[in-house]
Each structure stands twice: as structure tokens, then as C-alpha cells.
Amino acid sequence: MFILTMGLNHHTAPIDIREKLVFKETEEEMALITLLQEKSILENVIISTCNRTEIVAVVDQIHTGRYYLKRFMANWFQMDMEKIEPYLFFHEEKEAVNHLYKVTAGLDSLVLGETQILGQVKHAFEIAKQTGTTGTLLNKLFREVVTFAKKVHHQTKINENAVSVSYAAVEVAKKLYGSLENKKIVLVGAGEMSELALQNLAGSGIADITIINRTKANAEILADQFQAKVGTYEEMNNYLSIADIVLVSTSADEPIIKQKDMQILMSQKSTSMLVIDIGLPRNVEHDCSYIPNFHLYDIDDLAGVVSANSLERQKIVLALENTIETEVQNFFEWEKQLGVVPVIRALREKALEMQEITMTSLENKLPGLTEREYIQIGKHMKSIINQMLKQPISELKEMSVENDAPTSIEHFKRIFGLTELDITLSEKTQEQAETRS
């Protein structure tokens, strides 16, 4: 089994490609199940955010796994494989695990050190686990990377004062207008990005803030926090006609601000308008950028501002490289030891079987034993067995990560009289126990 990651992100693909390859949350379970049915795919998790679409998979062979991952992407999004392929990246085994650690900790994000991706990765794993597309390897891996990312944010404080996309949006507005005093702003969408933007706008002298959202209750909650007004979708163009700045961030699948509407609106408007679209797929039709005085920015346009991350946080990233390498090494040592788990289980079961035989013999030879005495003897015998097995099992685990592991394990099995039948029966017993639980 091999760990293989395939994806595209803000490093490898422009926004006009990324927005075509986003998995809708409502279809994610079906996508996971469909991918699992592909040849070579044994486990999978799909991570799909505004800046990346990545699939982490366990495959039986690397070369067939790569092909079937690409084929799945092409089929799911109904695009030619040749059109997608130039934007895809692949990471195998240690590179794949290293990459996932960095992604989850926010070290590969457009916004270095941001914590939003941690929640997104955790959510992606939970959906895959509930859907039944993860197994032993990915369950262990994702638990480890989530725990690591939480520790990184807590111990290094890399996320403190992180330059966010919403911050960058506000900086672009300041650059265009010089001062935001007395400006009118409209926020379309009432999610986390809008809330962050409002926090960054605090104290800038904005004269008028209007929040528009399909679910009015969500807009009202945000409006109460920032003394803003609430508008409706039906009246959106009326609010835009008097706005200086518009920030758009919704989960809509198609643009909600159309070129034909904006052409009319801007022809009747005497002032310019800055529109910042941080939705993916994009919420504003790209052709709007050709309208005079309509200044349109999308996520990729904000990258230059975001890249102004502090030198101090960059140092933290470099310092974490060695820590991540250690985590990756530990994971693969654990994976190697998986191969001896059935052997250990069979050894324990054989020892317990011998205990049961001995206890039965003891009961027959010493019928005068009380129940309490019988139980105490059984406990002591089990303790002796555990102590006797502790060192051999520890040595077996050490053998499993050495170069000649297969030969050493075979010697171990022969010394303790373990047959393939013993191991097979032990595995079946374990499977039955897991099914019952």
C-alpha cells in the first residue's frame, strides 16, 4: 500500500481553473464513494477549499493510482484529462505525508499560518470517515496531522497577526482611495470572510456598511456586531449603485453579479467602484473588469498583498521543517510496524490458549481450589505471560523497521512456532470482533 496525493492549488493553477474543479459540499460523499470504486484506490479523503482541491489516497500501486486519480477528476468534472493534467501535482509516500502536515498547519496556504485550513482538513477527514472511505492508514495519518497543526498554532503563535485575504482586501481599498473615511461599503455574504473584513475595517472611518445575504438572519447577526445595515438580494443593485467598495464572498456556484447589470449600473453612476471577489467559484463575472471605473480584484489579485507576511513567521516555518520531518519519519515507522501486528496478535493468542489449557488442567488436578483462588492463579499466570512476551514483542517491533525485516520476522515466527494458519485465524477473530463492535 502507498500514500499518494494529487491536487491543484494556488501555486499550480490560476483561479479560472481552480473554480472549475471545486467539489460541492453536497456532492462530497458521492465523490468519495465514486473514487473508492476506481481501480487501485483503497482509501481516500478529498480536501476542497477556495485555494486548493487535493485528494489524499491509499493505493495498491503508484503508477495505476496516479492514472485512476486523474481519470476520476476528469470524469467527475466532465473535463478532458489533457486539460487538467498540466495543473496537477503529485506527491508520493513521504512527500505526500510531508505535504499534508504543511497544508494542515497553514504552512502551504496563501495566508501563511492561517487556521481556517485546519478546520477544513479536519472536516474533510470527518466526512470521509463517516462515508467509510478511510481505513487504518488515513485514519492514523489525519489524526496525527490535525493534532500536530493544533500544537503548532498553540506553541508557535504563527497564526497571530497573520495577513489574511480579508486584510489584503481592505489594504487594496486603502491603496485605491487613500482613505476610507466616509466611504460606503456593501458586503455580499455573511460568512467568516465578511466578518474578518469588518474587523479589519474597524476604525477606518467607513460611513455606511450594508450586509446582503440570502439568509437574512445571518446578515442580521453580523450587522448587530458591527452596527451595519441589512439589505436584500432583490435590492442588491440599488445598494451597489451608491457603494464605493463591494466585498463579495458567497458559496454560490455561479456569478451573482453579472456584466450586463453592472454595465447599466456603472453608466448611471458618477463615481468609481472597487469590487473585491473572494468567492470560489468566483461570484462576479470576469467581464465586469472591462467596464470603465469598475475595479475588480479576485483572490489571485490579492496574492501580492498577502505575500507580505512577516519575516518572523517565515523563520517559524523554517524551524518547523525538521519537526515535520521527524513526524513523517515516525508515521512511516508506525506503518512498517503494522506488518507485525498480526504476528503479535497471534503470539498473544497462542500464549493465552496455553494459559487456558494449563488452567483447565489445574482445575482437574486440584478440585479443592476455591473460585477466588482459581481467579487469582489465572491473574498471576496472565501477568507472567505478559512479562515474558514484553521483550520479544519490543524486539519484533524494532525488527520491523530494519532493512532485513522480512527475514527477521520469519525467524521470529519460527522460534515461537507461529504458522501462517495461526496468523490467519487471529486476523479473522479480530475482524469478527471489530464487526460486533
Swiss-Prot record:
Highest taxon listed in the record's lineage: Bacteria
Domain topic, free-text comment: Possesses an unusual extended V-shaped dimeric structure with each monomer consisting of three distinct domains arranged along a curved 'spinal' alpha-helix. The N-terminal catalytic domain specifically recognizes the glutamate moiety of the substrate. The second domain is the NADPH-binding domain, and the third C-terminal domain is responsible for dimerization.
Binding positions for substrate per the UniProt entry: 49-52, 109, 114-116, 120
Listed name of the protein: Glutamyl-tRNA reductase
Plastid keyword on record: no
Associated pathway: Porphyrin-containing compound metabolism; protoporphyrin-IX biosynthesis; 5-aminolevulinate from L-glutamyl-tRNA(Glu): step 1/2
EC number in record: 1.2.1.70
Annotated gene: hemA
Role, per record: Catalyzes the NADPH-dependent reduction of glutamyl-tRNA(Glu) to glutamate 1-semialdehyde (GSA).
HAMAP family found in the cross-reference section: Glu_tRNA_reductase
Subunit field text: Homodimer.
Residues of the active site: 50 (nucleophile)
Catalytic activity: (S)-4-amino-5-oxopentanoate + tRNA(Glu) + NADP(+) = L-glutamyl-tRNA(Glu) + NADPH + H(+)
Residues the UniProt record annotates as site (Important for activity): 99
Gene Ontology BP term (one): protoporphyrinogen IX biosynthetic process
